[in-house]
Regions:
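Bacterial N-terminal signal peptides
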Residues: 19-32
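Copper-binding active sites and cupredoxin-like electron-transfer domains
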Residues: 35-372
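Short helical patches
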Residues: 5, 21-24, 43
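Hydrophobic residues within membrane-embedded alpha helices
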Residues: 13, 20, 66-69
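N-terminal secretory signal peptides that target proteins for export/translocation
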Residues: 1-14
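Intrinsically disordered, low-complexity terminal tails
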Residues: 1-3, 33-37
């Protein structure tokens, strides 16, 4: 792994020193954790069995720049049959964004969107990740990808001051759907302010063909103001520590998947949802009202281990992949079925299904007024 940090153009000496101090503290925090891990690793074991070290042996052919997408969009499925070098360019941007109607929040983002950009690579690829921290950022940032086998998931090699850039490489060894997030101290603050996203490592054989793929990520916000209180809101650390979120939302805002922003599908199509949970605290009880999941890839693994599932748990810092066919037109409702979160804190979205009706699937025979 390699690391490059430079002093940003236009910053005063004081600003640069402050950023360096923050970076030093974050590095000390990271190194202390690494030291603890080394002590644990060094402990003797009486029944130690050698585990073969996995060495990437895929021939790397050429290179390409990764297509990164904003939620709910997903990059196209990978059609190549060989491993390649994938260049991922990811910018950290701190910006004020809408959290709810009349409510703003200064989000710390990967790529300027909430959640962070969706990254799609193939098992066996060599990934070269360039992390740039915007010169107007107030903090150093880094990235920990749960798909990475290496120190801190990349965090140790990517600590980046405002205006700087870090570069590291990793082999995409394990297929699956993974969360990535900032791991700069204080880690809970960075995650609570929006620093998370998803990376999909497609299996070499690819995924089963579907008609639609969407990116949905749940998370919480802990604001000083009450739910719906107007104006610019800021992080309430005490609420975060006590796990009392003001908002629980999909894709970074109340209403991000409703109205004209609702997901779209047609009768007869198969839908795949890549579902993530940025946390920082809660486990999601993910459910789609009006549908049953035909296949669930539990915790983002590559095997559809469950079928005909009503609700699946998505842990903080974890994921799930769900697939289902849509047989009936109308609005399907995405919720966290810890139901107060859906109707009182914002964890609610819609999938609008258009097409011909099918009374054999469902028909209303008697309305509220007693008419047929």
């Amino acid at each position: 792994m390699s690391l490059h940090i430079h002093r940003p153009h236009g910053h005063t000496v004081a600003q640069t020193l402050l950023a360096l101090l923050c970076a030093l503290l974050a590095m000390l925090f990271t190194f202390s954790l690494a030291g603890c891990n080394r002590v644990a690793d060094a402990a003797p074991s009486s029944d130690h069995t050698a585990v073969p070290v996995r060495v990437p042996n895929d021939e790397i052919v050429g290179q390409e720049v990764a297509v990164l997408t904003e939620a709910p969009n997903v990059p196209p499925a990978i059609t190549r049959t060989h491993a390649t070098r994938v260049i991922v360019n990811l910018d950290v941007i701190e910006k004020t964004m809408r959290l709810a109607d009349g409510v703003d929040y200064t989000m710390w983002t990967f790529g300027g969107s909430m959640p962070g950009r969706f990254i799609r690579v193939r098992e066996g690829d060599q990934v070269e990740l360039h992390l740039k921290n915007d010169e107007h950022s107030t903090m150093p940032h880094n990235i920990d990808l749960h798909a990475v086998t290496g120190p801190g998931g990349g965090a140790k090699s990517s600590l980046t001051i405002p205006g700087g850039e870090s570069v590291f490489t990793f082999a995409a060894l394990n297929p699956g759907l993974y969360v990535y997030h900032c791991a700069t101290a204080p880690v809970p603050m960075h995650i609570a302010n929006g620093m998370y996203g998803m990376i999909l490592v497609e299996p070499k054989a690819g995924l089963p063909k579907v008609d639609r793929e969407f990116y949905v990520m749940q998370s919480e916000f802990y604001t000083h103001g009450k739910f719906g209180e107007k104006g610019l809101q800021t992080l309430d650390m005490e609420k975060g520590i006590d796990e009392r979120p003001t908002y629980v939302v999909f894709n970074g805002a109340v209403g991000s998947l409703t109205g004209d922003k609702a997901l779209q599908a047609k009768v007869g199509e198969r839908v795949r949802l890549f579902v993530g949970n940025g946390g920082p605290n809660l486990v999601s009880s993910f459910h789609v009202i009006g549908e049953v999941f035909d296949n669930v890839y539990t915790e983002g693994g590559t095997v559809a281990s469950q079928h005909n599932v009503q609700t699946t748990l998505v842990p903080a810092g974890g994921s799930a992949v769900v697939e289902f066919g849509v047989e009936k037109p109308g609005d399907l409702i995405l919720v966290d079925h810890s139901i107060f979160r859906a109707f009182n804190k914002g964890a609610l979205g819609m999938l609008h299904v258009s097409g011909d009706d099918n009374a054999k699937v469902f028909a209303s025979l008697k309305g509220l007024g007693g008419t047929h």
